[in-house]
Amino acid sequence: MQPATQLQFTNHLSPNGQCILQPPPTPSLPDKMEKAPPQPQHEGLKSEEHLPQQPAAAKTVSRHIPRLRAVVESQAFKNILVDEMDMMHARAATLIQANWRGYRLRQKLISQMTAAKAIQEAWRRFNKRHILHSSKLLVKKVRAEDGNIPYHAPQQVRFQHPEENCLLSPPVMVNKETQFPSYDNLVLCRPQSSPLLKPPAAQGTPEPCVQAPHAAGVRGVAFLPHQTVTIRFPCPVSLDAKCQSCLLTRTIRSTCLVHIEGDSVKTKRVTARTNKAGVPETPLSRRYDKAVMGPSRAQTQGPVEAETPKAPFQICPGPVITKTLLQTYPVVSMTLPQTYSASTTTTTPHKTSPVPKITITKTPVQMYPGPTVMTKTAPHTCPMPTMTKIQVHSTASRTGTPRQTCRATITAKHQPQVSLLASIMKSPPQVCPGPAMAKTPPQTHPVATPAKSPLQTCLAATTSNTSSQMSPVGLTKPSRQTRLAAMITKTPAQLRSVATILKTLCLASPTVANVKAPPQVAVRGSIHDNPPKAKATMNMKQAAEAVKASSPSCLAEGKIRCLAQSRLGTGAPRAPAKLPLEAEKIKTGPQKPVKADMALKTSVAVEVAGAPSWTKVAEEGDKPSHLYVPVDVAVTLPRGQPAAPLTNASSQRHPPCLSQRPLATPLTKASSQGHLPIELTKTPSLAHLVTCLSKMHSQAHLATGAMKVQSQVPLATCLTKTQSRGQPIITKRLIPAHQAADLSSNTHSQVLLTGSKVSNQACQHLSGLSAPPWAKPEDRWTQPKPHGHVPGKTTQGGPCPAACEVQGTLVPLMAPTGHSTCHVESWGDSGATRAQPSMPSQVVPCQEDTGPVDAGVASGQSWKRVWEPARGAASWETRRNKAVVHPRQSGEPMVSMQAAEEIRILAVTTIQAGVRGYLVRRRIRVWHRRATVIQATWRGYRMRRNLAHLCRATTIIQAAWRGYSTRRDQARHRQMLHPVTWVELGGGARVMSDRSWVQDGRARTVSDHRCFQSCQAKPCSVCHSLSSRIGSPPSVVMLVGSSPRTCHTCGRTQPTRVVQGMGRGAGGPGAVSRASAYQRAVPSPRQPRRRDKAATAIQSAWRGFKIRQQMRQQQMAAKMVQATWRGHHTRSCLKSTEALLGPADPWSSSQHMHWASSQHTHWPGI
């Protein structure tokens, strides 16, 4: 608004004392008045000199006053004021709208930001929960890996070294249902400080060795302190659940030893403690003793031709086992006072017939005079034991009896006695005599057959920890001491003192009825030309006593120990090698005699991948248990047929080591025609019972004579024909035992009959899966022959056309049909490939063979197997590519049950991950939709609320504006309507016009006319012209046309009105009086102008007052509106978070100037 011109009037006194208002000169006026000097208002009498000038000044002022008043009171000036007010209101409305739009925008942004923050917070909470859930899963996984030992019976409590927890990673438990071994559950035996462990220098060997000489009742392999050799056995068995895995540092294999693969194996510290006999024993041996001493039943007598798989294979740091010195110990009749130079059996009566021990290490290994496959080794031959042809009567129950009951029994828990190569040492293999030495017919080949010397395994001690007296002739009831020992072993509290108890019990009853085995049962072995033949007969009870006598220390807790065996020449004891594997606990029952004619005509050369760790012992102590261990089946040539020596039978460095060795001589008597009635023993299997790795890992190879190790060609898949007694036998692959475990999970421990009838019945229910219809019964239990092997020679040839690389074949150690020869191939690297080809003539182990299966433990282990693929298992594509095909349709092997289970687990994991991802994505989508709905609802609510506030504010503003406009219009209307009042005539007189007269002394409006120039101060010229003269009232009535006219000042269009004039009335006294009265009332134009001036001043003052009053009202209304808006805006800003976004009143500065200018605006009081 433009600042209004402040008119200041000064009062000038005229000479007559009249106050004259004189405004100061205003340059902005259009008429540009001259400047007049201001004079004091109350000026006294002046001198006479100045008197003439004052009237002139007064005259000049009076001449300019009308024009100033006319300008101030002109309609143009008023229009300017109105325009300024309109502009002010327009600006105010614009500011209000802009502020409202900004407020709306800020509210929208705030709502969006709030919604975004809510969404982000929700997402953060979800992500946190997801991370916490993942961490919980990881913790659960770690806990599952740490505590993956399922519930074990009290007798299965494991005592571990405190340093076991510091190993690399937890073992992968094996599913008991599948009976499939894991890939990293072997133990790296770290040598403990023991008086029996001696450095190689003490042994007189230039190179370090991993194998310690075997002594009666001693099992295990000890790593010398200077050796750090990580090994992996072909058939690893789950040891303690706390066993850790480590990477192999060297890959060592030898023909005599089982495959040593460069892969992850389990390491475990085995602490040796001295038992009561003063001989250090390892916890493994103690556990072995406990497991073996469980239900010890005297088994029927029979020749033993398969080494017990309890002895771990010996490991040499070098790939080729050289310098294996053959040390023969003369075997004397089995008597209790017999002493073994390297016997580790504590509290075992010394026996006079030492057993030849072989040490398959780079140190000068003392090897028993069995044909060994050691090449590049100048065998040291110790005096060969006199025992070559021995008829081993079945000794006491193999379970509770240590190896010391007889030389044959002694070899049960440790590795097979392997004689060195005949080509190297020309010494025939020696069979350790059984407790009852029966002279076998001289069907022994001389050791001249360089590599074809028969196994040096005491077949009487075949099944380690098992009462596996082969082909028992008669069932003998186990002694009470044996049963008592079995009961004692079930007590966890006596795990550590069981050795002493067993010793005391076993030494109590020395006499037992003498039992002799028929000549068919006699064990036949190739005899050296020099050593004499020794026969030792011993009754079953004495054998049992001998077993018990030696077992307290050896079998106390099923641990395997290898005591240093001093050679006969030097007498230096060898350091006992601690078995890295945990001995399996087995219970044996009396085995029924097996018909010799039904037995297969093949001798068993058992090569065991490793001793499995049994996690559960059979519930009933008296129930027999079947022991199944992966074994290498080697077909022995018919007697009298020499086998070609294998010179480069050194260890191949390929992980799957295939022992291709024809057995040099059948280990059975000529009358038995190679039938080896194997005593069937059943061992409670937890996860790898079917794959129970016996301790006679590599010695079976040595005992089998010269054998060739081919690492890359699976022996089981090569169908070769061997002639045993002139009959070709097609070697077959036995079906993986873990498949049988699935089918026989609910079986109980039963005694398997070794007869052909029993074997046919036992495996009849599995014939549909194991052996196809075209498979012949005799083919099911035939022994696979090495690749390229012919009866007369041994070749190093590659795989047969049908051969395919298979890893992890599991076969039972003892077949129901007698001694089912089988071959165990090396397991794959880290379990990467576990598919096992099922050849057309595979035989599935019977339900009785696989042993009892704990469903709860199996399920728990199978659940824990879910995490196994993450620790080195093959990828999904690798397993998926192994399609299950029919053996006749494709040469590829059938996928094993374990691989199929892993594939299923991976599939289930993938499906679960997909489902979880889908559920999470769907949940997030639902959250987004719900957030959108919430945001939309909130925005709608805010919009409606703001709209309601806006409507209320608008209503208030509009009401205020309408009131203001109405009041302004009314004021303007009142100002434009100035009624003309006539002077009241005398009483009773009436002014007669057409219809209106002033009667009863009342004055009435004569005319409502308002001229077009009514806005001006001076009267209308028309009205003035029509006004009545003195004595003559108006008599002319002006009739206006119908066309409207618009005022040039107010801009209103109004119709023309009739100006009522005073008509000439009738003559008479009334008229005269009326005219005189009118004449008095109407001022005369000749009156002095003084009155006119006074009236003008009064009117102008009144009008100024009215205008100022209206202005004050308008200002008050504007202030009210502005205050209302400011309060509303401030409250809105305080309610929101936008109070700090900017100034709440952006137009405060201009408003302040406006109010300042308006407050100082006032009208002159004239």
UniProtKB/Swiss-Prot annotation:
Supply the SUPFAM superfamilies for this chain: P-loop containing nucleoside triphosphate hydrolases (SSF52540)
Give the region (Disordered) as residue ranges. 1-56, 431-450, 769-797, 829-848, 1145-1166
One Pfam family assigned to this protein is: IQ
Per the record's keyword annotation, is Membrane included, yes or no? no
Instruction: Pinpoint the IQ domain residues.
Output: 89-118, 907-932, 928-955, 952-979, 1091-1119, 1114-1143
Q: Could you tell me the Gene Ontology terms of the biological process aspect for this record? A: spermatid development
Assembly description: Interacts with calmodulin.
PANTHER family, alphabetized: IQ DOMAIN-CONTAINING PROTEIN N, MYOSIN MOTOR DOMAIN-CONTAINING PROTEIN
Give a short account of what the protein does. Answer: Essential for spermiogenesis and fertilization. May be required for manchette assembly in elongating spermatids.
Annotated protein name in UniProt: IQ domain-containing protein N
Instruction: Give the source species.
Output: Macaca fascicularis
Q: Name the gene behind this protein.
A: IQCN
